[in-house]
């Protein structure tokens, strides 16, 4: 793409076919609907909270310099992805990572299950 190489990452959870795009050379991740400031939605029949967590696990370990989401603030710190992953882990440990689990507010972002 314009002399740049982007790796397509299948990151289901928000939707079955959700994808992120990883530009390893620059450390950019285009996260789409996986992570952004605002309310993340994992409450619809097409969402899967467990797969969402798996996608967060796989992407949070990338050596990111920039996190570029599809909504709201377009350039947010890459550490947000790790914070979202950690919160999803905590919800799983509490037995709340499931449809109907509730809405959980973490300040700059929230998740509705």
Language-model segments: which ranges?
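Catalytic core of the metallo-beta-lactamase
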Residues: 1-61
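Accessory terminal helices/loops
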Residues: 57-66, 70-113
